[in-house]
Structures are given as structure tokens and as C-alpha cells.
């Protein structure tokens, strides 16, 4: 059992020994890893509802206290620095030191995904954000009356070119190019920015990041898809993460699935999972025969493809408990400093 008062006193005493803001931030990150992460793991593993609720409240209290202690001591440094500059300093002098940088949490998750796909010998593809109607819609079996083709949903440059609405367009081009070498086992993953005419709010953005993959091989089946996706979910969210596959519909896969993970904050439903006990993560499926034919594969060869599209920001928000997607883009250093790698 955590002795809350002793833990907070240890944090406070240690923060007061910091010599500068960089060391102060290092202390805070150390405390998060050593004291709070084990508690979060305990919450995920606990099955008793009351225990989970109690530990969740304790985690929120400790996290808030840690941030408050850090901010209080940081204010001491800020005031001392301002006083020193105003009294003695030459404000025109160049800075003698800079705070160390760190990769953004979006790219931390992209790196995790890229490392996962590289373990399975995928070619990782980063292509142009500009694409054609054929690659973005026609060759992916998206009908001409589909809402995503509308001018109100997509950024068109002219009658044939547009900003891609998904990374599948890049993956499709790479697969067609790779097929020219008669490779019997094609593994392509693409990532990058995609664009949609959405109004920016807590869960939507007109520009966000996506990772898409296709793995095409003889005799592939749903078993291969479920095995591969479950392993990827475990890689991102931790071993033994429960996942379920719900039948859905996408024009480019048949059958199609929405993949959900078990909500780690509750047992009987909460605000995060909208009382369903499950949280939607991504879409996947077996590539539609028409899409396979459009890429030059013959149905008689019994070649099948598995595919999925993954919203990076959604994974980041789920992984770190972030409720507003705009927080990822606002360049709030205080917010971003919590997730230094």
C-alpha cells in the first residue's frame, strides 16, 4: 500500500534540491516512471471494481500533486531568473544554454509502430501527400457517390489531384510497384499526414497522421489478420491487452472489422468507453477481390491480402489518456514536457 504522505514529502524534498529547470523536469519524469507507472499498471491488471476505482482516484490525486509540486518549484526558478536579468543582466546577450529537445509524442508512437512493422520485414514507405482520384478512390473500390469524394469532405487541387484522405493511396502505389518484381510476399507500411475537411474540435482535425499497411501473400486468411493485429495491439498497449473484432464495412476490404480494446479504467462502463467497456482503436480486414484485381493480382492464384488503417493521434490519446486532440498541436511546452522520451 502506498504511503501517500511520505511519497509526496519525498517528491517535495527532492524537487527543492534541483539546481535548474532541466534537473527539475528530470526529477518529475523520474517520479512518473518510478512511482506512477507501476500504479497505472496495477489499475489495468486489477479486476475488482472497487479496488480499480480506488486506485484510479489515487492515481489522479498523485499525478495532480506531482504536477503542482513541479510547477511551484519551477516558479521559484522563473522568478529568480527574471529578477537576475532585470537587475544585472544584459537582455541583448545571446543565450548560453538551451533546454534539451525531445521527440513529439505523435512521433514516439509512429516510431513504436514502425519498429513493429520492421520486425516483420515490412518496407516502410513515406510518400507524397498529393495523390490522384484513381489511387485515393477508384482503385480502392470506393464508389463515385461515396461521401468522402464530395468537395465538402476532401481538399481537391484540380479535377484529378487532391490531398490524400488516407495513407492507403500511398500503400497501393508501393504495392503496384513492388509487384513488378514478381515478389510472392509483399509487405508495405505507409505513414504520414492525411487531410479531411473536418471542423477542428476535441476529437477531429482537418490534418492528422495515419499508418496503413498491406501484407499480400498466398493462402492468407482471417487467422493471419487476427494474429498480426493482436500482436500489434500488445506491442502498443502492453501484453495481454484484450481485443475484439466487430464486423463492419469498408469498400476496400471484405470482410471488414473494427477492432476494439478493453477499457482499462472500468469493468462496467465509464465515460471514456461510453458505457460499452470497449474502446474503438482501428479498422482492418481482408483486401477486397476488386482491389486485388486493380493492383494486378489474379483471384485464381489464391493470393490474399490483409490490411489496416491506424489513426496515430487516436493511439496517442488512448495511450496517454488525452481527451482533446488539439492539445497535441498547440505547442504547449508545459503539456508536451510530460511525455519526453
UniProtKB/Swiss-Prot annotation:
Pfam families: tRNA-synt_2d (PF01409). The keyword Methyltransferase does not apply. Its EC number is 6.1.1.20. Its cofactor is Mg(2+). InterPro entries: aa-tRNA-synth_II, aa-tRNA-synth_II/BPL/LPL, Phe-tRNA-synth_IIc_asu, Phe_tRNA_ligase_alpha1_bac, Phenylalanyl-tRNA_Synthase. One of its GO terms (biological process) is phenylalanyl-tRNA aminoacylation. Binds 2 magnesium ions per tetramer. GO terms for cellular component: cytoplasm. CDD domains: PheRS_alpha_core (cd00496). The keyword Phosphoprotein does not apply. It catalyses: tRNA(Phe) + L-phenylalanine + ATP = L-phenylalanyl-tRNA(Phe) + AMP + diphosphate + H(+). Keywords: Aminoacyl-tRNA synthetase, ATP-binding, Cytoplasm, Ligase, Magnesium, Metal-binding, Nucleotide-binding, Protein biosynthesis. Its main location: cytoplasm. One of its GO terms (molecular function) is ATP binding. Mg(2+) binds at residue 254. It is found in: Cytoplasm. Tetramer of two alpha and two beta subunits. Belongs to the class-II aminoacyl-tRNA synthetase family. Phe-tRNA synthetase alpha subunit type 1 subfamily. NCBIfam families: pheS (TIGR00468). This is Phenylalanine--tRNA ligase alpha subunit. It comes from Mycoplasma pneumoniae (strain ATCC 29342 / M129 / Subtype 1) (Mycoplasmoides pneumoniae). The lineage of its organism: Bacteria, Bacillati, Mycoplasmatota, Mycoplasmoidales, Mycoplasmoidaceae. The gene is pheS.
